[in-house]
């Protein structure tokens, strides 16, 4: 994706014009090696596992073998993993669930087909996101939905559509981001070429920092996007239907924990807020 820079760690050319899109090469650890790591943490009594691979559900020959090895051992893990929307096929969900994958972080990003295809320059397959969410729910897998506001072609109307989609298709967890031109990403090179304002410090690339400096779109200022993102997050997490979903699935304590987080308003320099007490953030 144009906003992602994770593959930059694989680059073999350090020239300034090289981005993560030019470095889309990686190698898999063998499943028989990976299961050894699961064996080790199982012996330690660890149950909760987060698989950091952002594209775990991508290559069936890889992730299905890992699931098979976990299932064979009868481990009772509670696993969080990640998937693209278009690779999370229904035929894999039962096996993922039996291996202990109870959560999948899903890159929904934007429900608008045109906007989503603009940032996916690879072989992204078009899918009905609503169907994917329903299939995951039917399989007993909770979803961490990830949304991005302020993509290059975003307008206020399209951002409202994204929020409306999230509100109508509630997931157990929702991350809402402003589009950020991270160094090493194609979006960063495009922003520099276009003369767009970028952060002047690394904390400016943080989504929750006082110094956050997200990217402007072709139609909206950075400030308009950031304000919308912060308000959208609050709207979602104070939605009575969402809170009822949390309470029904995870109990009153979990619901109250989320409610307490909504009492904290992020301070933003670009939106005219005074610095938070206690120093820089």
Kindly give the residue locations of the regions a language model identified.
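Internal hydrophobic scaffold segments of catalytic domains
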Residues: 167-191
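Generic recognition of well-ordered alpha-helical segments
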Residues: 132-135, 164-165, 177, 228-231
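Catalytic cores of alpha/beta
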Residues: 92-94, 152-168
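Conserved strand-turn element in the central/C-terminal portion of the radical SAM core barrel
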Residues: 84, 109-120, 133-158, 177-183, ...
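Histidine/acidic-residue-rich catalytic or RNA/ligand-binding cores of hydrolases
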Residues: 63, 159, 188-189
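Acidic/polar loop patches that form or flank catalytic/metal-binding clefts of enzymes
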Residues: 144, 172-177, 243-244
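Radical SAM enzyme core and accessory elements
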Residues: 186-188, 193, 197-281
